[in-house]
């Protein structure tokens, strides 16, 4: 059997997010069908008027913040790619979401109550939060960011380093009068010292370190530019939760699952730190919050997908959910374990179809032609994936995107690789 062989054929630009075409053959960004070079100018005409299917509220949001909308669309495309990765071994593998352009919420499956619907909605909501919050921290959006805060933090860092240096000299018995002359690192590596440090009373500026701090390396404080997760959550909520009546079961489960997706991002924010000091030392650190890697977000939501709760709606039209006894696995999903809080779990209210055959009404492309693993007993095995129809063994040569990197805004730079391999294909 011939081993897979990859040959890089060259770089191609794969347009995502605010792009209309998946092919990109010119230098610059093809933003919504407009050929522009360099950083795009995202205006309401360039973004909003080319998006079909927007609600009135979404159109108002887009006109007010076209740059944030473009970032949200990029997050949606990232989420679709992650959805395809996480459900690659399932009969429904998110591929149909790509067929609905920039707004997959028009997809039939996202307007149903399946387990797959819940997972997809939560991942799309998480993608919007992640993309918008990250763009904010990079200063790419007019409505948020912290460039001014960065400059203020730089001044604070220089002052803090100076204080720590002077305290070091004080503890070492070095004359403060000669410290400024003998330590060029203070000015050469960290910019000019604040003017008031050259006064005749530098001791007045020193703030003694706490007694429990015995080493300068233990000193850290908040700084840098944290991802504006609150702004991302707010825009995701305003953008995605605005469809349908809140009393409709479809809308209520959608809003619930959107919230679960956003919560996974906020719950997994992590602290990132940077060292500051002379000559490569780490005299103290500034730290800020960053969003989790989106692969982690996808993996955590997949776990929730596998344990999603089957619910029914009370007939009181008051928005309350009840978990049903018995799920799609044929047994009570809560039996033998502590009852879970439904607020952090994905919920669904319709039993999923088998997705074996093409069925546009539920966005099923079927599994004919899908590659399966004949040695796997799982969902990706030929027995399950091919729905009992059997499989063929074929030698396949294909091209695929590889080594992709997302760039602001709004494209993905990929290499195109050629793959030749023997595969098992569902009949």
UniProtKB/Swiss-Prot annotation:
A lipid is attached at residue 279 (O-palmitoleoyl serine). Residues 1-28 form the signal peptide. One of its GO terms (molecular function) is frizzled binding. Its main location: secreted. It is found in: Secreted, Extracellular space, Extracellular matrix; Secreted. InterPro entries: Wnt (IPR005817), Wnt_C (IPR043158), Wnt_CS (IPR018161). Keywords: Developmental protein, Disulfide bond, Extracellular matrix, Glycoprotein, Lipoprotein, Secreted, Signal, Wnt signaling pathway. Disulfide bonds join 83-94, 136-144, 146-225, 273-287, 275-282, 356-387, 372-382, 386-426, 402-417, 404-414, 409-410. GO terms for biological process: canonical Wnt signaling pathway; cell fate commitment; midbrain-hindbrain boundary development; neuron differentiation. In the embryo, expressed in the developing central nervous system (CNS), with an expression pattern very similar to that of wnt1. Palmitoleoylation is required for efficient binding to frizzled receptors. Depalmitoleoylation leads to Wnt signaling pathway inhibition. Belongs to the Wnt family. This is Protein Wnt-10b. The gene is wnt10b.
């Amino acid at each position: 059997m011939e081993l897979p062989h990859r040959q890089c054929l060259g770089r191609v630009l794969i347009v995502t997010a605010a792009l209309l075409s998946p092919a990109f053959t010119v230098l610059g960004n093809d933003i919504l069908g407009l050929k522009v070079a360099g950083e795009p100018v995202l205006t309401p005409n360039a973004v909003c008027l080319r998006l079909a299917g927007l609600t009135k509220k979404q159109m108002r949001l887009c006109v007010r913040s076209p740059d944030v909308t473009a970032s949200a669309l990029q997050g949606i495309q990232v989420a679709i790619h992650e959805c395809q990765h996480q459900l690659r071994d399932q009969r429904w593998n998110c591929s149909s979401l790509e067929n609905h352009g920039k707004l997959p919420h028009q997809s039939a499956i996202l307007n149903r109550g399946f387990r797959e619907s819940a997972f997809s909605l939560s991942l799309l909501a998480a993608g919007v939060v992640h993309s918008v919050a990250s763009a904010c921290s990079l200063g790419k959006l007019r409505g948020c960011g912290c460039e001014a805060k960065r400059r203020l933090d730089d001044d604070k860092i220089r002052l803090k380093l100076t204080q720590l240096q002077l305290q070091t000299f004080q503890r070492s018995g070095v004359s403060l009068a000669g410290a400024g002359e003998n330590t060029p690192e203070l000015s050469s590596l960290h910019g000019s010292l604040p003017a008031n440090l050259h006064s005749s009373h530098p001791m007045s500026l020193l703030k003694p370190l706490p007694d429990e701090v015995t080493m300068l390396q233990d000193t850290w404080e908040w700084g840098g530019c944290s991802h504006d997760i609150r702004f991302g959550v707010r825009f995701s909520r305003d953008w995605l939760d605005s469809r349908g009546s809140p009393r409709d079961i479809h809308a209520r489960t959608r809003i619930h699952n959107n919230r679960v997706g956003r919560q996974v991002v906020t719950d997994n924010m992590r602290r990132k730190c940077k060292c500051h000091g002379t000559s490569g030392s780490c005299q103290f650190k500034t730290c800020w919050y960053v969003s989790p890697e989106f692969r982690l977000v996808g993996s955590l939501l997949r776990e929730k997908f596998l344990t999603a709760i089957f619910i029914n709606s009370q007939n009181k039209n008051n928005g309350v959910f009840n978990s049903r006894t018995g799920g799609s696995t044929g047994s009570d999903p809560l039996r033998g374990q502590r009852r879970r809080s439904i607020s952090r779990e994905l919920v669904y209210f319709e039993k999923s179809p088998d997705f074996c055959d093409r069925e546009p009404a539920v966005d099923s492309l079927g599994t004919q032609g899908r590659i399966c693993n004949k040695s796997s007993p799982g969902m990706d095995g030929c027995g399950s994936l091919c729905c009992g129809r059997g499989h063929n063994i074929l030698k396949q040569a294909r091209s695929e995107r590889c080594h992709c990197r997302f760039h602001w805004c709004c494209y993905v730079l990929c290499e195109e690789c050629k793959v030749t391999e023997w595969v098992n294909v569902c009949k």
